[in-house]
Amino acid sequence: MNIHEYQAKEILRVCGVPTPAGFLVQEDTETSEIAKSLARLGGKVFAVKAQIHAGGRGKAGGVVICRSVEEAIDNTKKMLGMNLVTHQTSPAGQKVRKVYIEAGQSILKEYYLSMVVDRENAKVAIIASEEGGMDIEEIARSTPEKIKKVFVDLSIGISDFHARKIGFELGLSLAQIKQFTPLVKKLYALFVTRDASQVEINPLIANSKGEFIALDAKLNFDDNALYRHPDTLELRDLYEEDPKEIEAAKYNLNYIKMEGGIGCMVNGAGLAMATMDIIKYYGASPANFLDVGGGANLEQVTNAFKIISSDKHVAGILVNIFGGIMRCDIIAEGIVAAAKDIGLTMPLVVRLSGTNYSAGIKIIEGSGLNIVTASELDDAAQKIVKLTRKEI
C-alpha cells in the first residue's frame, strides 16, 4: 500500500526524522486559509508539491519552487484539479486532489537514502548515493558504482557500523556521521515495526546548519501485514487506486491494470506473467494482470469477466487455466455461466490444461457460445491476437 508524501512525513516526524514544516491544501480549502497558513509558515520561499501516488513529479511540473505568497497560492490553484502525467502514471495522468506546501530549505548537498527488502539475500538493503534528487534513476543506470548498499540481517538487526559504513561511502565527515547514524537507525526501526516494503528519502539534504532533513519521502507498506496496522490502513487513499483493482480485491482477485487491449484471466502469478509475455511476443499487449488463484468459484470467475470487460480498451479476452486443485470442468462451467450472465460479445479464447480438461473443453464447445478453444498456450495467444485484429 502506498501513501502520500505528506502522510509519510508525518510518520517520519513521529519517528524523530527531521522534515520541513508544511501544510496540506485540498480542493475545498479557501484561498484565505492558504494565505494564513503561508504566513504562519514564514519565510519567502515555498515548495508547492502535488500529492499523487507516482514518482517523477518534479520533472512533470508537480513540484514548483515559489518565491512569494502570491506565487505559491497561484501555483497551488493551478495544480489542484489538474491531471499530472509522469513516467509512472498512465498516459491520462493522475488527478491532483491535494497539494502540500512546505517552507523552502537551504541545500548544501542532496543525497539518496532508501531501504527495501532484498529477496535474493533475505535481508534489508540500505541503499544510498551521494547524488540524490530527480535524476537518481538515470544515475543508477549510467553510473551504478555511485549506488552504495549495505545489507542488514533481520535476525540480528541494525548496528551503528551499518550506518557508519554507508556514511563513509557517501563521503560524510565525522561530524555528519554522528547525525547520520541515528537517522538511519530510526528509519530502519520504522521499516521493521511498520512492516514497510520501501522507505525512500530522496533527496535527503544537508542544510547550511549542518542538519540532515528529509526533503521528500516515500513509504510503501506490505499489504499482507496491514491487518497488524489499522492506523496505517486508515491512510489509504482510494482515489489514487484504480477502481477495477479495488473491485477485484473484494473478490480476492489479484488484478493490475495495464495499457494493452487483450484481457487476461489466469490462475497462478507465474502462468499469468508467461501469458502476458506470449501476448507481447505475438505483437499485442495485455490489458491487465489477473490471477484468480487456485480455487476460484463461480462468483469470482463472473466478477473477473465483469472487471476485465469493463475496461473500454479491451478488445478480447484470453483465459489460461491449469487445473490442479481447480478442476477444468468446474472452471469451464463458470466461464460459460459468466459469459452468459454479462452478455459477453467480444472475442474469447480459452485454453484449459490439467485436471478434467477434456470435460471442460466439451462444456465450452457444447455451450452454443462463440468461445474459441485452444490446447496450447502458443496457439491460444495467436488466436486471440488474430481475433482482436479481425484476421479470423
UniProtKB/Swiss-Prot annotation:
GO cellular component, one term: cytosol
Residue sites binding substrate per the record: N267, G324, I325, M326
Annotated EC: 6.2.1.5
Positions in coiled-coil regions: none
Binding-site residues, Mg(2+): N202, D216
Pathway where it operates: Carbohydrate metabolism; tricarboxylic acid cycle; succinate from succinyl-CoA (ligase route): step 1/1
Pfam families, sorted: ATP-grasp_2, Ligase_CoA
Keywords: ATP-binding, Ligase, Magnesium, Metal-binding, Nucleotide-binding, Tricarboxylic acid cycle
A GO BP entry: tricarboxylic acid cycle
Residues annotated as domain ATP-grasp: 9-247
Cofactor comment text: Binds 1 Mg(2+) ion per subunit.
Catalytic reactions of this protein: succinate + ATP + CoA = succinyl-CoA + ADP + phosphate; GTP + succinate + CoA = succinyl-CoA + GDP + phosphate
Family annotation (PROSITE patterns): ATP_GRASP (PS50975), SUCCINYL_COA_LIG_3 (PS01217)
Assembly information from the UniProt record: Heterotetramer of two alpha and two beta subunits.
Family the entry assigns: Belongs to the succinate/malate CoA ligase beta subunit family.
Role played: Succinyl-CoA synthetase functions in the citric acid cycle (TCA), coupling the hydrolysis of succinyl-CoA to the synthesis of either ATP or GTP and thus represents the only step of substrate-level phosphorylation in the TCA. The beta subunit provides nucleotide specificity of the enzyme and binds the substrate succinate, while the binding sites for coenzyme A and phosphate are found in the alpha subunit.
Name of the protein this chain belongs to: Succinate--CoA ligase [ADP-forming] subunit beta
Native species: Neorickettsia sennetsu (strain ATCC VR-367 / Miyayama) (Ehrlichia sennetsu)
Gene: sucC
